Amino acid sequence: MKMLIVKLSSLGDVVHTLPVVQDILAAFPTAQVDWVVEKSFAPVLSAVHGLHRIIPCELRRWRKSFWTAATRTEWRAFKNDLQRDRYDAVLDLQGLTKSAVVARLARLSPAGQRFAMANATEGSGFEAPTRWLAHVAIAMTPHVHAVARGRRLAALALGYSHCPYADFGLKIESNVPLAQTFNASGAIKNIANKPTAKTVAFVHGTSRVDKEWPLAHWVALGQRLNAAGFQVALAHGSPREQAISQSIAARLADAVVWPLQPLDEVAGALAHCAGVVGVDSGVSHIAVALDVPHVQLYNVDTAWRTGPDAIASQGRQVSVFAQPAPSVEAVWQAWQAVVATSTG
């Protein structure tokens, strides 16, 4: 059997969909599972166990210049890549017009079908064409976690039952990032810094300002971690985030700033940390998928939809929610509980 997953973006949504691959392979061990995704997120999929083929696209860029010769050439190449195989099932797990169009372009086997969601779920995007262009539109419970939504849709479409807990299937190689370290005078030097059992990564970057945690809170938490014997490592994905990372690191006794690096290398670094503290962002969700001890911070009450499953992780991964933002003390207490659970 050949299956195609269409989940193009964003990073967090792609990560939340990863367990579908393992669910399908558990039900159909000889299945070929392919995935269409935005090119910038493809490095994460390259680390997924059992995924046969990654089909990258750049719809975000192409739609800005579709009528140029270069874009049209790239679009034709993408279509040729997409239509190389005929699929027994095409799963539109995104529920947007763009994903519906991609799913419609995929070729089917004689008995093949396209599946999609029939309705919106709370807090997630949905556009009606996704159900119009599918052979089968599956009704979803409106109040559902992002991970559970994709798993349920695929299971109902393909007729199998999945286990209660999600297996994200990430297989990560060791990674030693070049980092910036700050001494007491504020001078910067580059070092080869392999994360260790005493490294805690901070993931402060997010695409939404209302999800950010105050800079002073990061500094205060970092100081507590330093006092407890932990080094702090700071990730970033843009010049603005890099500046914030450097500002936090400069105020800590033991901190490093990782360089801008591909997502698979970020995942490799996170996998070797003692734990991660991060806001609701794609990189934080990678930490969850890696089963790294994790405290995820929420200024908005959406942890029920995107946060880690504290029960499945046996307390190794938790969410902390408060408005306008979680306090340093609350996050510190959560971290201590996570450490106790992880080392107990």
Residue spans of the language-model regions?
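Catalytic machinery of carbohydrate-active enzymes
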Residues: 1-344
